[in-house]
């Protein structure tokens, strides 16, 4: 599996610029940012990669042997990875409402028992 890992520090514009240096044509992006910069980071990544599914999270991250609570980490996936993304709506009121769509997306990628990850 071909992947890209990039990191950036500072305000979202600078951090995103640093983190995506060398990232071209990803099939999907997973990013980890600080809570205070999360929204702007997501917006900037979407501007740069408008047709790429992008999933973000907050929290402590371990990248290249460094543990960090601030800054940005970007993980890019490429065409050798099958990706399906969606939004689970009504999660607080009726979490099973999105089950049909989720099962459809899972079937589309033909998951195996040792080569599949589901990120919630």
Give short role names for the model-derived ranges:
Residues 1-120:
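Cofactor- and metal-binding active-site motifs of prokaryotic enzymes
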């Amino acid at each position: 599996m071909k992947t890209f890992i990039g990191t950036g520090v500072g305000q979202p514009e600078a951090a995103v610029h640093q983190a995506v240096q060398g990232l071209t044509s990803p099939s999907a992006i997973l990013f980890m940012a600080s809570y205070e910069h999360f929204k702007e980071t997501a917006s900037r990544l979407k501007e740069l990669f408008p047709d790429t599914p992008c999933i973000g999270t907050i929290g402590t991250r371990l990248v290249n042997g460094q543990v960090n609570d601030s800054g940005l980490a970007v993980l890019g996936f490429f065409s050798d990875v099958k990706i399906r993304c969606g939004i689970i709506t009504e999660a607080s009121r009726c979490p099973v409402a999105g089950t049909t769509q989720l099962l459809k997306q899972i079937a589309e990628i033909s998951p195996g028992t040792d080569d599949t990850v589901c990120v919630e």
